[in-house]
């Protein structure tokens, strides 16, 4: 929903400002389709000449979309609540070149192969007002889109 998307966008922009990055550009919200699911996407770009990409990544990740807010309190809560290894779920992935250019995304669904078995992982954001049944349906759609990539 747009409210959730705006919450994450505002979090990212506030953290850019915290790092004294003021010359950012925020694009328009667009709908991106992935298999049988659509996501709201907003490109945020900035010139970060003197900041190591990994410092920036550490400050921005994890965002409220995959962790909660405030970040430290949410991380502690998730650690106490979850009894499984998230693996690479919700991890940033991307590249950095020798000139310091970088491009990172967040893996909102993933798969890994362990001991000859494939394991899929996907999640959903629960916020005040979320309807759990709809969130479960969303997770099922995400998992189906992964399975379709592998098995179709």
Roles of regions detected by a PLM:
Residues 67-73, 77-152:
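Glycine-rich, small/acidic residue-mixed loop/short-helix segments
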Residues 3-79, 151:
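Contiguous alpha-helical scaffold segments within structured protein domains
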Residues 1-2, 127:
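Hydrophobic aliphatic residue packing
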